[in-house]
Amino acid sequence: MWSNCIFLTLFTFYLFLGQSCCQTDTLLQGQYLKDGQELVSAFNIFKLKFFNFENSSNWYLGIWYNNFYLSGAVWIANRNNPVLGRSGSLTVDSLGRLRILRGASSLLELSSTETTGNTTLKLLDSGNLQLQEMDSDGSMKRTLWQSFDYPTDTLLPGMKLGFNVKTGKRWELTSWLGDTLPASGSFVFGMDDNITNRLTILWLGNVYWASGLWFKGGFSLEKLNTNGFIFSFVSTESEHYFMYSGDENYGGPLFPRIRIDQQGSLQKINLDGVKKHVHCSPSVFGEELEYGCYQQNFRNCVPARYKEVTGSWDCSPFGFGYTYTRKTYDLSYCSRFGYTFRETVSPSAENGFVFNEIGRRLSSYDCYVKCLQNCSCVAYASTNGDGTGCEIWNTDPTNENSASHHPRTIYIRIKGSKLAATWLVVVASLFLIIPVTWLIIYLVLRKFKIKGTNFVSESLKMISSQSCSLTNKRLSTLRVGSTIDQEMLLLELGIERRRRGKRSARNNNNELQIFSFESVAFATDYFSDANKLGEGGFGPVYKGRLIDGEEVAIKRLSLASGQGLVEFKNEAMLIAKLQHTNLVKLLGCCVEKDEKMLIYEYMPNKSLDYFLFDPLRKIVLDWKLRFRIMEGIIQGLLYLHKYSRLKVIHRDIKAGNILLDEDMNPKISDFGMARIFGAQESKANTKRVAGTFGYMSPEYFREGLFSAKSDVFSFGVLMLEIICGRKNNSFHHDSEGPLNLIVHVWNLFKENRVREVIDPSLGDSAVENPQVLRCVQVALLCVQQNADDRPSMLDVVSMIYGDGNNALSLPKEPAFYDGPPRSSPEMEVEPPEMENVSANRVTITVMEAR
C-alpha cells in the first residue's frame, strides 16, 4: 500500500514536471506524425510514437506510458504490418480516413470511414486513441474510430473483452509471437463463444485456460488473482463483454493493466511496473510465485499435464485442480516426467520435419509443445530468423562439422533430474495413504455411531496439509470441491466421488450424483429470479436445466434457514435408498463450501395444492383424476410402510408435498422429517414436534408419538381435502362453524348428509357416485382419534376398491372433535407451519433438528 502511494506521488510529480508547451494530444486533419514526433495525452500519461526494437529495421506505431519506468507498448497499430525503416508516418487525410504511410504510399488504413466534416485524432488520458468528427464550435460530434476497439496484447481499464452480437466485432487480446516480435501470436484472451459469462485463453484455437463462471460479481475460479481489478459484466441485446476499472488501493483508475505474454500467462502490471500473475497457467515444475503459480524458463521444464478436456490445471506442481470440459490433447506419456531441453548453437546435419501452418506463424513456445507431444522428437528449432516457425527432429541434428547449414539455436531434449519421478512416487504414496486413512476413520465412526469430532477434523486437516492435492474425481461437467468437511459429509451420506456416466447408466444407479456449485449455478442461470419456483423453510427452490438438457428442480439450503445439516442428510440418504414410481426422484446433491443443495427430477405440473385449492384450476381435477391421485399416494405410502427395504414414516403428508408429473401422476416428496423404523419397531417418540398444522395426528401433536398410523391420519385429512376441494384448516375464521374440515364432514356424516361436502366442481355425477361416498367413509376411518382404530395403508387399499357387498365399519369420533389440540407441558412444540398454496415444484417444510 505504501509503495503504491510513493509511486503514485512520484508519477504525478513527473507528469506535471514533464509538461511542455510544445507537446500536443491532437493530430489535425492533413497533419503528419513522423518518426521522432509524439502525441502526448493532456496529463502526460500516455504517448503515441513510432518505435523499433534493437537490431531491427521494422518500425511500429504504438501507445506507451509516458514515464521512465513503465516500459512496453500497450497498443500497436501495425503489429502485423511493420514499416521498413524510418519512412513511416501517420495522417488523417482529406476524407477523414486514418492511415499509416510508408513514404508516400499507404501501408495500412486504420479507419476507412469517409466524412466531409472536420476530423481530428486525439490521444486521451485513458490510453484510448480516438478519431473524432468535430462540430463547428469545436466540440466532438461523434467518434469515428478508436484504438480501444482494436486491442493488441494489453488490456487497460475501460477496455472491453467480449463481442458485438450484431456486427460480429470481437474485443480480445492476442499475444506477441516473440519478445521483439509483436505480430499476432498463438494465445487469444477473450470471452468464451459458448459460455458468455466466462473468459478463456485459447492456444491455437483450443481452450488453454478458463476463468470460471461469472457469479455475484466475481469469477468462480478461486485462485484467480483479481486484486486491483474491479470487474463488471455487461450483457445486452447487441453486446456481451467484461470490463474492469482500477482499485484505488492498487494505483488508482489507470492501473493495473493486464497483458497476455507469449506463453499464455496473464500478467498484472502495477503502477510500480512490477509484473504479477493474474492466473495460474497449466502447472509446471518451477519456482513458486504469488497465488501458488509456478513459472520458469519454459524450455527447462515439462508441464505435468497439458490438457483441455476434463483437463485439470491449477496452482500446484501436480496438475490437479480446476476442471472444465473441452476437446483434449494430452501430452505424450513420455513427456510428462523427467525431460528437459538444453539450448545449443550448432549447424544441423540434416533437415527435420517442418510444420507448415497455413495462415499462422508458430512461436518458439508452440514449437516446444509440438515436440513434447511427439515421443519421437529429440530436438526442435525455429525456422525463421525472427524466432518463428517450427522444425523438429527424431535424431540428434547437431553437427559441429556440418558445412551445409548455418549455425542456429537448437533445443535438445535430454533426460533431466529425478525430481519429477520422485514427486510421482510421493504423490502416488499420498493417494494411497489418504483414502485408506479416511476409510479407517469412517469405519470407526460408523462402529461407534459418532458423527465427527474435533480430533478427527484436525487429524484430517493435518493429513491434508501434508499432501499438496487430493484426488480429483471429475464428473464430466460436474465437480465438487474437496475440502475435509465436504468429504466427511459425503462419506456419511455413503456417496463416493465418481464420474457421471452415460445417461442410461445413471438412471440405473440408485446412488446420488454429485453436482458442483458452478454447474448448478449455470443450470439455474445463476439462481435468477426468473427460475425461482418458491421458497420455504429449507430455502429457495429453482428450476434448472443441466448441460444435457434435462430439467431439474433444485432446493438450496438458505444460510438463514432454521433447518440444517441433519435434515439435509436425512432427505439425501432416504430418497437415495427409496425407488418407487410414486416417490419423487432425487438425482443428486451439491456439497461445496457453505452450499448444500438437493437436485430433483422436475415436476412440470407443480404440486397438488396448486390445483386443488384454486377455484379455476381445480376444474382440471375431475373425479377420475382425483381418485387416480389418491391411488398413487396410497401406493407410495404402502411402499414406505411395508414393501421398501426400509420401513419409513414420512410424518409430513399434505397436498403441498404431493408433486404431479407431466401426466398428473402423484409423487410424494419432502423427506426431511421422515424416520426409519426397525423391523420390529412400530412407534417412536420425539420431544421436538414440528409439522404442518391440520395434518398432524393428535398423539404426535400432544405427546410426540408417531407411527405408521400418523401417516394414515395425514392421508385421511388429504383424502377429505381431495374430495371436498377445501383445506382442513379453512374453517378456523368461522367462530360459529366447525373447527376444521374433519369435524365438518363428521357432523354431516352423522346426519347422513355427506353428499353436501363433495366439491361442487365435480358435478352432480360425483354426488351420486358410490365410490366417492365410500372414499369419504374411508377418510373418516383414517382420522379417528385413537391410532389403534385407524386402518393400515394395506387395509386402505382393500377398502377403497371394495363395493357395496364389502361393508365398511362405521368410523368413531375423529381427532380434535373435542376442541383445539393442547400440548403436554413436557413437550417442546415448534410453531406449526400454516398451509399455503404452493407455487413450488418441490415443496419445503419447516423442520427442527431432532
Curated annotation (Swiss-Prot):
Record's bilayer topology term: Single-pass type I membrane protein
GO BP term, pick one: response to fungus
Catalytic center residues: 652
Family annotation (Pfam families): B_lectin, PAN_2, PK_Tyr_Ser-Thr
A GO molecular-function descriptor: protein serine kinase activity
Residues linked to a glycan: 55, 118, 194, 374
Cytoplasmic domain ranges by topology: 445-850
Transmembrane segments: 424-444
Binding-site positions, ATP: 533-541, 555
Gene3D superfamilies on file: Bulb-type lectin domain, Phosphorylase Kinase, domain 1, Transferase(Phosphotransferase) domain 1
CC annotations in GO: plasma membrane
Tissue expression remark: Mostly expressed in leaves, and, to a lower extent, in roots and flowers.
Ranges where the PAN domain occurs: 334-416
Disulfide bonds: 367-390, 371-377
Enzyme nomenclature, EC number: 2.7.11.1
Extracellular topology ranges: 23-423
Residue intervals of the Protein kinase domain: 527-816
Region named CaM-binding: 616-633
Protein name, per record: G-type lectin S-receptor-like serine/threonine-protein kinase CES101
Organism the protein comes from: Arabidopsis thaliana
Gene: CES101
